[in-house]
UniProtKB/Swiss-Prot annotation:
It catalyses: beta-L-fucose + NADP(+) = L-fucono-1,5-lactone + NADPH + H(+); D-arabinose + NADP(+) = D-arabinono-1,5-lactone + NADPH + H(+). This is L-fucose dehydrogenase. Belongs to the short-chain dehydrogenases/reductases (SDR) family. The keyword Transferase does not apply. Pathway: Carbohydrate degradation; L-fucose degradation. SUPFAM superfamilies: NAD(P)-binding Rossmann-fold domains. GO terms for biological process: fucose catabolic process.
Length: 258
């Protein structure tokens, strides 16, 4: 299926690895132009693969917790391409800031995981109105299930879902669609780092995978990317304000089925 994304310009925050990297790559395969916003330069092999798929794909170094950098990077994107068709808010980290961490640590977690979602939307929306574009917010199943000992991350992910609905309402008259994708267990570099903290990482992986109803396996970054890119496309032209769980039934299906 042609998603009709050729030459559409899409900013992807945290778009150089993991879920964000998969989204950038899928956009390039659809002949869209991904603009990767990331703190650190992407791996050379990733950039080469991206350029093979879409020579106009671009990386911009951006510290998303710096509002001025967000503003300037969006302005640079517009100066380079003359338009903006989509925003994928993706960057963040499950940082383990729980109830014992204190207010300052909690607020810092919101800065890492939530505030830049708003900042990016704030600076992108005027341009998205001009193209009747789309926003996709990458959230997490922790927004609806909790996890324990990660208050900052869960608060951020829950707020992202609320903002998805709020922005969908606020932007409806401008034809800008806003949706959220909600992963659960996805094997990414950050997830591997977390698994490595367990005494027996392989046993922990097997334990988690066994609880996923559909296929007893982890969701892949590509499966998240497929959904996100579809939502960015005209093929999802009457879909807005939705929360799409892409998790093999992990969040909602009866665990007795497993």
């Amino acid at each position: 299926m042609d998603l009709n994304l050729q030459d559409k310009v899409v900013i992807v925050t945290g778009g150089a690895s993991g879920i964000g990297g998969a989204i950038s790559m899928r956009l390039a395969e659809e002949r869209a132009i991904p603009v990767v916003f990331a703190r650190h330069a992407p791996d050379g092999a990733f950039l080469d693969a991206l350029a093979q798929r879409q020579p106009r794909a671009t990386y911009l170094p951006v510290e998303l917790q710096d509002d001025a950098q967000c503003r300037d990077a969006v302005a640079q994107t517009i100066a380079t391409f003359g338009r903006l068709d989509g925003l994928v808010n993706n960057a963040g980290v499950n940082d383990g800031i729980g109830l014992d961490a204190g207010r300052d640590a909690f607020v810092a977690s919101l800065e890492r995981n939530l505030i830049h979602y708003y900042a990016m939307a704030h600076y992108c929306v005027p341009h998205l109105k001009a193209t009747r574009g789309a926003i996709v917010n990458i959230s997490s199943k922790t927004a609806v299930t909790g996890q324990g000992n990660t208050s900052g991350y869960c608060a951020s992910k829950g707020a992202q879902l609320a903002l998805t609905r709020e922005w969908a309402v606020a932007l409806r008259e401008h034809g800008v669609r806003v949706n959220a994708v909600i992963p659960a267990e996805v094997m990414t570099p950050l997830y591997r780092n977390w698994i490595a903290t367990f005494e027996d990482p392989e046993a922990k992986l097997a334990e988690i995978a066994a609880k996923v109803p559909l296929g007893r396996r982890f969701t892949t970054p590509d499966e998240i990317a497929d959904t996100a890119v579809f939502l960015l496309s005209p093929r999802a032209s009457h879909t807005t304000g939705e929360w799409l769980f892409v998790d093999g039934g992990y969040t909602h299906l009866d665990r007795a089925l497993v």
